[in-house]
Curated annotation (Swiss-Prot):
Its EC number is 2.5.1.75. It comes from the Bacteria. Substrate binds at T16, A17, S18, G19, K20, T21. It catalyses: adenosine(37) in tRNA + dimethylallyl diphosphate = N(6)-dimethylallyladenosine(37) in tRNA + diphosphate. Keywords: ATP-binding, Magnesium, Nucleotide-binding, Transferase, tRNA processing. Catalyzes the transfer of a dimethylallyl group onto the adenine at position 37 in tRNAs that read codons beginning with uridine, leading to the formation of N6-(dimethylallyl)adenosine (i(6)A). Belongs to the IPP transferase family. This is tRNA dimethylallyltransferase. It comes from Tolumonas auensis (strain DSM 9187 / NBRC 110442 / TA 4). The gene is miaA. Gene3D superfamilies: 1.10.20.140, P-loop containing nucleotide triphosphate hydrolases. Pfam families: IPPT. Its cofactor is Mg(2+). The keyword Magnesium applies.
Length: 310
């Protein structure tokens, strides 16, 4: 919303490893801001190293809301996020402070800005039928089925993503409308004035280097032990959204004996680079966003100036 009478909300978006957390902490020191995490991986407890969750020292300087709110066994939807984020925003604004939303889960930002389309509730019987078909024919065959029904959704959903794939098919079988058709119907928009920023390096190779360096740092910090603790629980599996997070899936496959350690490292870095590429694709089509260069010394100045001049 652009109405100046509405309280301001700052969005600090960007691909993974672009420097969002460091900039957010700097902003908290300069503005009356409270941070709300916009990250589908940081919601999980016990998943700290592989998600690059802010450290205890960083959280002491700048507490983050919506961290550690789910067990890895649980799911969390864009609708859940919107409900939680709106509650946190309302609380922060009521205290006379500015909500600073930080993260790279672009679907969450979209849900918050535009509202959610009226998708049908899950139907256990239809979901069971889809899973039975997958057991018989494989998810690749079901992905081909989705391709013929809803090519836009099929292009966005990987054949190895059974949760999202089955949901897209389920929506069509329940409603007779595709996921793409239904999501074009907007819900209630965000009733705040948003100042939107995206931080990323202009040089793609620099982002790739930052991703590789961070992955190796995670390994040195005990990432394998972190995932092994999850693996040894016995109630988690590779199809859960938590374990499908980049890095976790590849480490899980290594612990499961499916791939070598070196292959795990290679795949983990590649998967993270692919995530960053998807995030950048979202951001390039984003409206009303101000771009910031990773590492630039005046990024906080730009945001502060935008806030006072808006």
């Amino acid at each position: 919303m652009t109405d100046p009478r509405h309280p301001p909300v700052i969005f600090l978006m960007g691909p993974t490893a672009s420097g969002k957390t460091a900039l957010a902490i700097e902003l908290v020191k300069r503005l009356p801001c409270d941070i709300i995490s916009v990250d589908s991986a940081l919601i999980y407890r016990g998943m700290d190293i592989g998600t690059a969750k802010p450290t205890a020292e960083e959280l002491a300087q700048a507490p983050h809301r919506l961290l550690d709110i789910r067990d890895p066994f649980q799911t969390y939807s864009a609708a859940d996020f919107r409900q939680d984020a709106l509650r946190e925003i309302e609380t922060i604004v009521a205290q006379g402070r500015i909500p600073l939303l930080v993260g790279g889960t672009m679907l969450y930002y979209k849900a918050l800005l535009e509202g959610l389309s009226p998708l049908p509730a899950a139907d256990p019987l239809i979901r069971q039928a889809i899973e039975a078909e997958a057991s018989l024919s494989g998810w690749e065959a079901l992905h081909a089925q989705l391709q013929s029904i809803d090519p836009v959704a099929a292009a966005r959903i990987h054949p190895n993503d059974p949760q999202r794939l089955s949901r897209a098919l389920e929506v069509y079988r329940i409603s007779g409308q595709t996921l793409t058709e239904l999501t074009q119907t907007k819900g209630e928009q965000l009733p705040y004035r948003t100042l939107q920023f995206a931080i990323a390096p202009t040089d793609r190779e620099l982002l790739r280097q930052r991703i590789a360096e961070r992955f190796h740092l995670m390994l040195s910090q005990g990432f394998e032990q972190e995932v092994r603790a999850l693996y040894d629980r016995g109630d988690l599996n590779a199809d859960l959204p938590s374990i499908r997070c980049v890095g976790y899936r590849q480490m899980w496959e290594y612990l499961d004996g499916q791939i070598s350690y070196d292959e795990m490292v290679y795949r983990g870095i590649v998967a993270t680079c692919q995530l960053a590429k998807r995030q950048m694709t979202w951001l390039r089509s984003w409206q009303n966003v101000t771009w910031l260069e990773t590492g630039a010394i005046n990024n906080a100045d730009i945001i502060c100036h935008s806030l006072t001049s808006a």
